[in-house]
Amino acid sequence: MSTTATVATTPEGIPVIILKEGSSRTYGKEALRINIAAVKAVEEALKSTYGPRGMDKMLVDSLGDITITNDGATILDKMDLQHPAAKLLVQIAKGQDEETADGTKTAVILAGELVKKAEELLYKEIHPTIIVSGFKKAEEQALKTIEEIAQKVSVNDMDILKKVAMTSLNSKAVAGAREYLADIVAKAVTQVAELRGDRWYVDLDNIQIVKKHGGSINDTQIIYGIVVDKEVVHPGMPKRVENAKIALLDASLEVEKPELDAEIRINDPTQMKKFLEEEENLLKEKVDKIAATGANVVICQKGIDEVAQHYLAKKGILAVRRAKKSDLEKLARATGGRVVSNIDELTPQDLGYAALVEERKVGEDKMVFVEGAKNPKAVSILIRGGLERVVDETERALRDALGTVADVIRDGRAVAGGGAVELEIAKRLRKYAPQIGGKEQLAIEAYASALENLVMILIENGGYDPIDLLVKLRSAHENEANKWYGINVFTGQVEDMWKLGVIEPAVVKMNAIKAATEAATLILRIDDLIAAGKKSESKGGESKSEEKKEED
């Protein structure tokens, strides 16, 4: 590695400076070795968290805030990485997390195992281009295998969808409540799913997640409607309204200030009284217009004047102010109402319906529950837990589980977990490799070994002997009928994972394989690492900041 200025010479021997002094350049095998080491280091950080028996990580940021999690995306997000190859891997992993809700750890660990196998091939003097070509062919066969063995799943297969959610939750800190939470997840996702043409569409933004610490995880509940994290604005208003007709307002119930600055000259108290009466009448008219539509609940995004609160209370209307815009949009989907920006245009047809609107105390706070719509296309999950960290980790776990169930509904396919898919792909790759022959055959076989290493990590984290169990798994997969055989990490037995209920979205597996292969091949193609030097220094080595201090 060179850290001095890079100099080239012309045919006449004239030196030409290419890189500034302070720049560094690493090239050839050394650059490849360093990049591979960086990827392996990121993989090592995640390996112990893989699978249902994986460990947690305690992450402390620069402010001293502590996060305890085994969520791959969270760990990578909070790691302060410096090496460009490591950052590249994290970017690809984040892309996996955005594309599908799970599979981040699988993508990173598989990428790490692939570059390890590539490193072994490099020591055998096999060119990186040949390795990349072999990996690409192996990836193609792996994706083809998943498409062939994946099982069809529909939105009505509630039992399978619950098992998908449970599989996702199994590896989280909330695994003790996985059955209860999986039921909530499956109900929430199927409720907001919509059939568009011949495909199912799921927008997870229509599932509101509200967190309140207190109680236990088992107090977490699904609400077929929306929870507004506000309280009723006036003590004289009803706290419970059945058969609610809801006005959703993106307009204030306050006296509007003129756009232009204006002054009103008042010469005697009667004029002041008339002015205040006129303001009051304006607000009363607004309330009367709302009441005339038949509304008995008002959810307002903006403010509600005290006078308007008084008149709303007199008419027995429950009102909430300063609701979030996102809550208003979800309420519209949940209740069938329409958000109105001008009170004068409010009609009975704009009102939403809910069987019950009620203010309830949750922990230390009061919240308004809007539930019991006829066919709500937006629902809420209220998360409870004794500690804020428990609530935060439950939220992360639920978001992953919601995403995996949504992935299965959108794609309509699922596969078994527990290493079954990886073993089946590895078996088929070993049969496919001799058909290619040459040095590429070695790369394809290395890809198969990397997939098997994923299963070995799963077994090791369960506390079992990986060599012994891998032999049993290979033997089981020789029989075509045993394609779903994997490792039960809770018993250490080789079992049919589909029958056991360990089920994952096919699209998550496919995207993890794509992301890992892309990361590994990208790293293998790099043979030159050029890093720019720090900003130039001035005045005999004094930095600009030091120079400025002297001037001050």
Swiss-Prot record:
Q: Which Gene3D superfamilies match?
A: GroEL (3.50.7.10), GroEL-like equatorial domain (1.10.560.10), TCP-1-like chaperonin intermediate domain (3.30.260.10)
Keyword annotations for this protein, in alphabetical order, are:
ATP-binding, Chaperone, Nucleotide-binding
Mind telling me how this protein is modified after translation? The N-terminus is blocked.
User: Under the GO molecular function aspect, what terms does this record hold?
Assistant: ATP binding; ATP hydrolysis activity; ATP-dependent protein folding chaperone; unfolded protein binding
Q: Which domain of life is it from?
A: Archaea
Q: Does the keyword RNA-binding apply?
A: no
One Pfam family matching this protein:
Cpn60_TCP1
- Does the UniProt entry include the keyword Lipoprotein? no
Entry function: Molecular chaperone; binds unfolded polypeptides in vitro, and has a weak ATPase activity.
Could you give the subunit structure recorded for this chain?
Answer: Forms a Heterooligomeric complex of two stacked nine-membered rings; one of alpha and the other of beta subunits.
Q: Which family does it belong to?
A: Belongs to the TCP-1 chaperonin family.
Q: What is this protein called?
A: Thermosome subunit beta
The encoding gene? thsB
